[in-house]
UniProtKB/Swiss-Prot annotation:
HAMAP family: IolG (MF_01671). This is Inositol 2-dehydrogenase. It catalyses: myo-inositol + NAD(+) = scyllo-inosose + NADH + H(+). One of its GO terms (biological process) is inositol catabolic process. GO terms for molecular function: inositol 2-dehydrogenase (NAD+) activity; nucleotide binding.
Length: 342
């Protein structure tokens, strides 16, 4: 492996461009070797934005980027429907991968990725559930694992966005937005989610016509805990993520510290972040740095393909619960030995 890990970044949109900047200017031990995007001009703009013209190759084809000189690892930040194919192409080349969520558009595709990796006999992919790298979430995880508050009984979660993009559907509140809470709950509690119920309040006047927003999503775990998630993607005021763990001997709450108090003529007010890239900027930096460090040691240490599959399976059950209005069990395949818990 070279002194700087050569990374091919797939996707040069909002997330991809941010990762191109991050690998080039923030993390240590890595460099951007290639960028691929179907829109060549967008890819060139992202590369030019970091002064990479001439030293970073630009491609419209994923496989060409994977085969570009100096590529030793892959960061997938393309649209979700392209992730499965890109992951399998990286596996075929033995390239380590950091893949943004979703790992695949559905659980069937996610399971194919899990099975392909299992056939290799070693982990190659880390999935981008960045909340595991957020300082507050890590502090809460440490507290729960330490047992000081007794067993966790409930998680109360809030996930709010300023507004939803034009293509957003009611199902996407679950399989796009709440997928982060799905992984966070599994990780914090150390349990699989076993059933989902979705309650549908009267839609907000600020929601686009036909969008069921907000929703209240209730998860049950295999260990008997309950997780509730308020998801509201057109709240209008900011990006807000909170979580409270209610345990036998106390509770712990995170997420309230990410506002800024502004004092000006006429008074003082709190300002809420407007974007997830602002709220979780440090978590993204730690996530990518951790991936680079582990990859340079020949390891995969973060959330893996099984976590990507589990999130997809739970989200599918959630969408069925949204459509039917009834409690829906989560149907999951057996966990491969490659992903057995330690």
């Amino acid at each position: 492996m070279s002194e700087l890990l050569g990374v091919a970044v797939l996707g040069a949109g909002h997330m991809g461009a941010d990762h191109i900047r991050r690998v080039d200017q923030v993390v240590s031990g890595a460099r951007v070797a290639a960028v691929a995007d179907p829109d060549a001009e967008r890819a060139k703009e992202a590369v030019g934005g970091i002064g990479g013209t001439g030293r970073i190759t630009v491609h419209t084809d994923v496989e060409a980027a994977l085969d570009a000189p100096g590529v030793e690892a892959v960061l997938i930040a393309s649209p979700g429907e392209a992730h499965e194919e890109a992951l399998l192409a990286a596996f075929a080349r033995g390239l380590p991968v950091l893949c943004e969520k979703p790992m695949a558009p559905n659980s069937a595709g996610a399971l194919r990725v899990v099975e392909a990796e299992a056939r290799l006999g070693r982990r190659l992919a880390q999935i981008g559930f960045m909340r595991r790298y957020d300082a507050e979430y890590r502090q809460l995880k440490s507290l729960l694992d330490g047992g000081r508050l007794g067993r966790p009984l409930m998680l109360h979660c809030v996930h709010r966005n300023v507004s939803s993009p034009p293509h957003f559907t009611s199902a996407m509140l679950i399989n796009s937005s709440v997928s982060h809470e799905i992984d966070a709950a599994r990780w914090l509690l150390g349990q699989e989610l076993s059933a989902v119920t979705v309650l549908r309040p009267r839609p907000s006047a600020g929601a686009p016509e036909g969008l069921l927003d907000p929703q209240l999503v209730l998860f049950e775990t295999e260990g008997g805990a309950v997780v509730d998630v308020e998801v509201f993607v057109n709240c209008g005021f900011g990006y807000e993520v909170r979580c409270e763990a209610v345990c036998e001997a106390g509770s712990a709450r995170i997420g309230a510290a990410h506002t800024m108090m502004v004092t000006a003529a006429g008074g003082a007010r709190e300002e809420v972040p407007q974007d997830y890239l602002v709220r979780f900027a440090d978590a993204y930096d730690r996530e990518v740095q951790s991936w680079v460090d582990a990859t340079r040691r020949g390891l995969v240490t973060g959330p893996g393909t099984w976590d990507g599959y589990a999130a997809a399976a739970v989200a599918e059950a959630g969408v069925r619960a949204l459509d039917t209005g009834v409690r829906t069990p989560v149907d999951m395949a057996p966990r491969p030995s490659l992903h057995d818990r330690a």
